[in-house]
Amino acid sequence: MIKSLLLLISIIIGIVISQEGAYPPAGIYVGLSSNFLTTEGESLTTYAQNELLSMSLPDQSGSSSKASYTFTSFKLGLTLDNIFYNQLQTDVYQIGWETISFELQWNYHICANAIFNPCENGNIQVGTVSGASAAVASNVYVEFNSTSTSIIATNTTMAFDQGAVQVNVHCSNAICVIPVSDIANEVAQNFVTELTNGITKAINEQVPTIEALFTPIKQIPMTLSNGDSFWINLEGTLVEESNPTADLPTITAALNGGVILENTDGNFVYPSQIPSYIPTDSQLESFTSDYSIVVTGFFIESLFDAVFASALPMTINPSQVPSASPVQLNTSDGFFSGVAPGLSQYPNLGIQVNCYSPVTPLVSINSSAISLFNLELSADFIILNGDNPFTAFTVLFTIDASLSTEILTDSPSTFSLNSTLASMTPNATIVTSTIGSVDATGFVQLMQMVQGVIKLPSPAYSVPSKYSMSNVELQLGTQVIQITFDLIDSSLLEKQKIIKKSINFN
């Protein structure tokens, strides 16, 4: 049985099909453990119960052709048990409780519109019968697009077995002849309407917290100097764990996870790749913490793809090279005159470099490193010969590299991935030349020189403000990077602090 807190995942999915143990290829898998779902389900149940028990139940009075009445001192007892979640159809879900038990009591004073106007007093009880079946559920509509997510709970209904709800009237007078049941039934029906409306309201009030759990990963917190930004494609599928044993089994959102480039002009560029790797069930389900993020190579490949699409083609002019750089873009520079002797025919002229046509690397992950293979980048070296610039030669760079990654806890609610270039194996091929021979090994040495100054971005991830993190861990496995941590409700921590202060006698 899929239960209510799966809604936490469904808010970020445009195409959702709940299935058991059949994971599709994806770039990101976000898992919520059975223990976490159970805890959150209990919190939602408590919140809904408290909201219903705090409903205003004012005194009522009215009259009909047969009698006038006054109802006072309403009291309500209510319990919700066994929270559940179902998918009804695409983008329409159901959240509710398998069992609802309640008892509503109030006092009555009623007078018949007859000779002598006889009046009676007593109390009325409306409630569920022990052992009978009564349930309540709300329809929840989820809408996701590239800019916003909307979750709305509507149409809460209660379902009863016949005889599950009874109305009992207790008259305290010696003689009781005035019929009260019809009016009591009407009040009971109105109460059920208020009750279902209250459940709808309680769920909708929790929507911001539910949405916030996944909102931080919609956009990669990284912006290039040109203002371009990067989003994650969150279309995906909900998957139950392969062999569920708990009432609330571990659930994973298998998300496309491709990185989408948003240009400053508002256009979107989607990845040229598609996900192909499927982690094993064990890789996705064996975590013991509350929360798991599993990343496959497709996410990294599409990130390179998006960065290249944003940054390239790129032109580097001589004026952009710092004066302290050991290599200057000039035909008379020691490096260029050494690798391309033919440049001596064009002394002291600037060189412009046009970089283009990248080939995104293939990514492989094992327990010790993230490896990049066959990254290709072409560069034209253009001599700025007055009004007649021309391409002196073109170099094709092919690079294999290895990345090391560590996780840093920046605050109780934020962590970042710090990746560094552990090793790099560059190769260079001279594709064309108009100035004679060019020594490709010189460009290999140049790439080796810049290895130490290459800086990789360290994107940060923040959990919703309701939570703080503990036990944050990073693990590399076969073709996956897995981050796991526990989520602690910050409000519970504050309550614990208050309790500790209250018993401190020093």
UniProtKB/Swiss-Prot annotation:
Per the record, the domain of life is Eukaryota
Cellular component GO terms held in the UniProt record? extracellular region
A single GO molecular-function term is: lipid binding
Which residues, if any, are the signal sequence?
A: 1-18
The answer to whether UniProt assigns keyword Manganese to this entry is no
Which SUPFAM superfamilies does the entry mention? Bactericidal permeability-increasing protein, BPI
Cited InterPro entries? Bactericidal_perm-incr_a/b_dom (IPR017943), BPI/LBP/Plunc (IPR032942)
Q: Secreted as a keyword?
A: yes
Record key words, sorted: Glycoprotein, Secreted, Signal
List the transmembrane segments: none
Q: Which family does it belong to?
A: Belongs to the UPF0522 family.
Name under which the protein is recorded: UPF0522 protein A
Q: What is the organism of origin for this protein? A: Dictyostelium discoideum (Social amoeba)
Upper lineage ranks?
Eukaryota, Amoebozoa, Evosea, Eumycetozoa, Dictyostelia
